[in-house]
């Protein structure tokens, strides 16, 4: 396939045009008064969004050279989204500002390699400054503010704060469609898994068709139970206590199932049998989770624990167990809190190591079940288009909130980046030549987000920047929604430090790459051969 090449200034200008097209489409969404963008879909209704990464992903330019620039900016947005879940528009605005200023200097004869070095040194100092001003989240209110700013909705902020309140930092929060127009949070308490009772004869509440066991003992094993003889000693011990028994095993059949059902019907021993959740290695891990949560042991051949030798100490305990046709919920497991913490830490480490998205999801689910539950945000809307857009905003806000829990919060509205210029000033003084110019490029770019927020809200960015910098309070900034100057922390205009940091680092990374580009190579488009037309007489 023949290729077309572009060199030097011509190549960089083509990249710049591509960058501008994407950035100009994305930056209109920045801030509380940012506009929406409507995206045509090849099927279904159009998507309405103000999420930077969703807009960037949809853009594919006709000119192949310009498209290379567009793809690089897309990379900034998606990388920031992957790391922090938000801040994609800020990252795009920063990248555009650095690229524009940088290309001016390269055209004037500056050395691109030295410019990149200066950019990197300035960004390093700015990131240190961001980390310095970050504050830990102080409670539910802060969580609500972070989520509300990301989703541009106080209602969504409250929902996420409620969900996080219930499940804690390690809990899992999922987003699903609601069957109504309402958006609300549904909470599943305790350890829940998708396996129900083996026989309907175990049912204690015929109206709801469920089994309710109060303060039961829990027998956990990875074996198939069919012969009753090995189980008789432990069944007798449990029957003497007068408490119910939940049996979790690979399968329960034959004599064992008959014995449990008959004892339940006679009233000798209230019990219920369910199959173990998962398959293979995952099943073993989940049984171990249940054992740790309830303070029991897994009666497994691998561990050398025989069913005949089981004592009441080997059984798990819980406050309550509910078993339906296809789900089991264990509430108030009596396991050692320290052992549960260790298990959660172990799963956390596995999450960090794994590269598979599926594996990550299943590990997070296991961790949430140990940590105390799963919250589901049910999203309702009048139309399919609104539902998609709302779900997307909630997912973004969730990611931003998790980022805030991780690295803390900083004043929002572009103020933190603007004030990070002070740290860059010191770098500029230390550097010389083209490296100094590189640091100045970052200095100038750090004011771009706040300028854009102000312009989207109909204000003059330069005037607002001057007024903010006249006050030394690091939290003093401009509330673009109300058009007032205020303390950003007190007003609840806050950003996760991780989002601000990632946006700056990713923007600088792409800007550096683009400035040091000398040649562009693209494939020559194939000339379409015209198909001969059929003569009219046919």
UniProtKB/Swiss-Prot annotation:
Its EC number is 5.6.1.7. CDD domains: GroEL. It holds the Pfam family Cpn60_TCP1. SUPFAM superfamilies: GroEL apical domain-like, GroEL equatorial domain-like, GroEL-intermediate domain like. It is found in: Cytoplasm. Together with its co-chaperonin GroES, plays an essential role in assisting protein folding. The GroEL-GroES system forms a nano-cage that allows encapsulation of the non-native substrate proteins and provides a physical environment optimized to promote and accelerate protein folding. This is Chaperonin GroEL. It comes from Thermotoga petrophila (strain ATCC BAA-488 / DSM 13995 / JCM 10881 / RKU-1).
């Amino acid at each position: 396939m023949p290729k077309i090449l572009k060199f030097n200034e011509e190549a960089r200008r083509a990249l710049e045009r591509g960058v501008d097209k994407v950035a100009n489409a994305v930056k209109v969404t920045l801030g509380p008064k940012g506009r929406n963008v409507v995206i045509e879909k090849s099927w279904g209704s159009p998507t309405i969004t103000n999420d930077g990464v969703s807009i960037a992903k949809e853009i594919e330019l006709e000119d192949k050279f310009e498209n290379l620039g567009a793809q690089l900016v897309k990379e900034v947005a998606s990388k920031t989204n992957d790391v922090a879940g938000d801040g994609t528009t800020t990252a795009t605005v920063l990248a555009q500002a650095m690229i524009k200023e940088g290309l001016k200097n390269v055209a004037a004869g500056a050395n691109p390699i030295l410019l990149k070095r200066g950019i990197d040194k300035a960004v390093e100092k700015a990131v240190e400054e961001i980390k310095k001003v970050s504050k830990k989240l102080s409670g539910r209110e802060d969580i609500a503010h972070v989520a509300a700013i990301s989703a541009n909705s106080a209602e969504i902020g409250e929902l996420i704060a409620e969900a996080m309140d219930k499940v804690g930092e390690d809990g899992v929060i999922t987003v699903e469609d609601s069957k109504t127009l309402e958006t609300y949070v549904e909470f599943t308490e305790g350890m829940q898994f998708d396996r129900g009772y083996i026989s309907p004869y175990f049912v204690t509440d015929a109206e709801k068709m469920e089994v309710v066991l109060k303060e039961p003992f829990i027998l956990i094993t990875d074996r198939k139970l069919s012969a009753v003889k090995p189980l008789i000693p432990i069944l007798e011990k449990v029957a003497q206590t007068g408490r119910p028994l939940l049996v979790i095993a690979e399968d329960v059949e034959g004599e064992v199932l008959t014995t449990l059902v008959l004892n339940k019907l006679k009233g000798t021993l209230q019990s219920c049998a369910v199959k173990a959740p998962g398959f293979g290695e995952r099943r073993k891990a989940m049984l171990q989770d249940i054992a740790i949560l309830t303070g029991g042991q897994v009666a497994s051949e691998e561990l050398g624990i025989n069913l005949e030798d089981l004592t009441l100490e080997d059984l798990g305990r819980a406050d309550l167990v509910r078993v339906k046709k296809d789900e089991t919920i264990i509430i108030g497991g009596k396991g050692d809190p320290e052992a549960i913490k260790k298990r959660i830490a172990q799963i956390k480490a596995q999450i960090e190591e794994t590269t598979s998205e599926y594996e990550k999801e299943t590990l997070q689910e296991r961790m949430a079940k140990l940590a105390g539950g799963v919250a589901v945000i049910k999203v309702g809307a009048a139309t399919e288009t609104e539902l998609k857009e709302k779900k997307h905003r909630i997912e973004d806000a969730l990611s931003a909130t998790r980022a805030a829990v991780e690295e803390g919060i900083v004043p929002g509205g572009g103020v933190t980046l603007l004030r990070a210029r002070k740290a860059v000033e010191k770098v500029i003084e230390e550097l010389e030549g083209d490296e100094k110019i590189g640091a100045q490029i970052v200095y100038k770019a750090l004011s771009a987000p706040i300028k854009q927020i102000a312009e989207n809200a109909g204000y003059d960015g330069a005037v607002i920047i001057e007024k903010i910098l006249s006050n030394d309070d690091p939290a003093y900034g401009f509330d673009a929604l109300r058009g007032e100057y205020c303390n950003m922390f007190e007003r609840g205009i806050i950003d996760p430090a991780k989002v601000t940091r990632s946006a700056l680092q990713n923007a600088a990374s792409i800007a550096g790459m683009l400035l040091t580009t000398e040649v562009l190579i693209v494939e020559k488009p194939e000339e379409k051969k015209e198909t001969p037309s059929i003569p009219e007489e046919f």
